[in-house]
Swiss-Prot record:
Keyword Nucleotide-binding among UniProt keywords: yes
Domain of life: Bacteria
EC number, as in UniProt: 6.3.2.2
UniProt pathway: Sulfur metabolism; glutathione biosynthesis; glutathione from L-cysteine and L-glutamate: step 1/2
Gene Ontology CC terms, in alphabetical order: cytosol
Name this protein carries in UniProt: Glutamate--cysteine ligase
Species in which this protein is naturally found: Ectopseudomonas mendocina (strain ymp) (Pseudomonas mendocina)
Length: 526
């Protein structure tokens, strides 16, 4: 343990400060495809009974009309976050009729690209803009890639904790700048160590053969309809997913907030030749919002993002620049197909400890060589993380994954102890023990467990459909309370009314609306 981490832990362990760790906030976003009872992509519109995908706070769509996204609020206890996520699932299942929620991250057998429906958000200008943005994603990356689902884990530490540490360390930055710098330092450490999360929680070692759609790849055939890599942990996070030459130059090393926002400013304002050639329109039909490297900031694909809640009409870069970093969004977590929610409480407890470790441990700037090694380690683990004797790069030297993983878990142990002291019980130590067991025995990892079942003769699709049916039974077995049901019904009703109100307002010319939106991007790109 570094001296800096020891000092910070000792300070937070003082009786007057211990309660601060109970004020961390959590939120979860879970994506999942709607499928029919045969495991085929549901081509039906977003169910109106779920409310408006444009305005509902908890239930929306991601890329496709068939790709649901469930969003929790924030809570200090991840158990409450998961309870809310579960209630959203139960309400959704009540409205899905005979449809199912697909259990893994990698999609079901997909129809041809033209048939995959892009999400629609109504006739308002903002609704149409969201649709055109998704048309641009299809043009740039293909629809198939947009059907991959994941879990996003949002996490923040209380401002009082940052202020306490700033005072004790004699830092003279503004409170906002210090907090932002500490979150960016957390992200640097996350880049160093996130390969560990892929080993422990990666759950996508195989996929439906049709996913590759004839594109070249290095995957092996497990059966007539399943492709895999024998030691993979997360094909979802491998380079078979978002292969974007346009984004290849966008690899900020997160040495400060300004360098991150500057790289995004440049990307949203710089034309990319292939996109320029395609153009923004074909006749009167919009193809993409613009021809820049990124149409909007959120198009940038990364395993973690610094975030700040935006005001109405405000862009993410503007929020970060004017008010600093508020929380981080972890975006690399696979959906665990063995779990109804795709994530459980022990995993959430461990991620809390892991992120707290990243926040409190010393985090030197990432030099270019180390930045590249972080990317290389991550890609190596997602494609062959369970390979016996696999070595990674640490400080320019080779180290066995198992050795480094064991060392990291030992370094996280004091964080788990501190969290348990703060909150009572031993839930974090128990969550850590589960992860130590996976390092000791690779067969306990979710990716190994998926392949163990597939090797018994099930195809990826058969396995995924079986899990989806089991989870549907779980959610439908216990209905919501009358009070919860009424709250969800009201939220759905209110969201539809809000969309209708938006669409009833005079909206002006859509081309002018997009031009104004583009002008806001250009204003950022300075």
């Amino acid at each position: 343990m570094s001296d800096l981490l020891s000092r910070r832990l000792a300070q937070l362990g003082e009786p007057a400060n211990l309660s601060l760790l109970g004020e961390c906030l959590h939120g979860i976003e879970r994506e999942c495809l709607r499928v029919d009872h045969d495991g085929q992509l549901a081509l039906t519109p977003h169910p109106q009974a779920l409310g408006s995908a444009l305005t509902h706070a908890q239930i929306t769509t991601d890329y496709s009309e068939s790709l649901l996204e469930f969003i929790t609020g924030t809570a200090t206890d991840p158990a409450a976050t998961l309870a809310e996520l579960e209630s959203i699932h139960r309400f959704a299942y009540e409205k899905l009729g005979g449809e199912l929620l697909w259990s893994p991250s990698m999609p079901c057998a997909l129809p041809d690209e033209e048939t995959i429906p892009i999400a629609r958000y109504g006739s308002s200008n903002i609704g149409r803009l969201k649709y055109v943005y998704r048309k641009g994603l299809a043009l740039r990356y293909g629809k198939t890639m947009q059907c991959i689902a994941g879990i996003h884990y949002n996490f923040s530490l209380p401002e009082a904790l940052w202020q306490l540490q700033q005072r004790s360390e004699g830092n003279t930055q503004s409170t906002r700048d210090y907090q932002s710098a500490r979150y960016i330092a957390l992200i640097r450490n996350f880049r160093r160590y996130s390969w560990l999360l892929m080993y422990l929680f990666g759950a996508s070692p195989a996929l439906d053969k049709g996913f590759m759609r004839g594109r070249p790849h290095q995957l092996q055939e497990l059966d007539a309809s399943t492709l895999y890599l024998p030691y993979a942990t997360s094909l979802r996070m491998s380079d078979l997913g978002y292969q974007s030459s346009a984004q290849s130059g966008l690899t900020p090393c997160y040495n400060d907030l300004a360098s991150y926002t500057d790289s995004l400013r440049l990307a949203v304002g710089t034309p990319y030749p292939a996109y320029v050639e395609a153009g923004t329109k074909r006749g009167d039909e919009w193809l993409q919002l613009n021809t820049n490297i990124l149409q909007i900031e959120n198009e940038y694909y990364s395993s973690i993002r610094p975030k700040r809640v935006t005001y109405s009409g405000e862009r993410p870069i503007q929020a970060l620049t004017s008010r600093g970093v508020q929380y981080v969004e972890v975006r690399c977590l696979d959906i665990n197909p063995f779990l109804p929610l795709g994530i459980d409480l022990p995993q959430a407890r461990f991620i809390d400890a892991f992120l707290l470790f990243c926040a409190l441990e010393d985090s030197p700037l990432l030099e270019s060589g180390e930045c590249g090694a972080c990317t290389s380690n991550f890609l190596k683990v997602v494609k062959e993380g369970r390979r016996p004797g696999l070595h990674l790069q640490r400080d320019g030297r080779s180290i066995e994954l198992k050795t480094w993983a064991s060392e990291l878990l030992e370094r996280i142990h004091p964080l788990c102890e501190l969290l348990d002291r703060s909150q009572g019980g031993n839930a974090h130590i128990e969550a850590l023990a589960q992860q130590q067991a996976k390092v000791a025995d690779v067969e306990m990892t979710p990716s190994a467990q998926v392949l163990a079942i597939l090797r018994q003769g099930q195809s990826f699709t058969e396995f995924a459909l079986q899990q989806s049916l089991r989870h549907a039974e779980y959610f439908r077995a216990e209905p919501l309370s009358a009070e919860q049901q009424q709250a969800f019904e009201q939220a759905a009703h209110d969201s539809l009314a809000e969309q209708a109100e938006l669409e009833a307002q005079p909206k002006g010319d859509f081309d002018a609306f997009v031009a104004a939106y583009q002008a806001s991007i250009l204003a950022l790109a300075v």
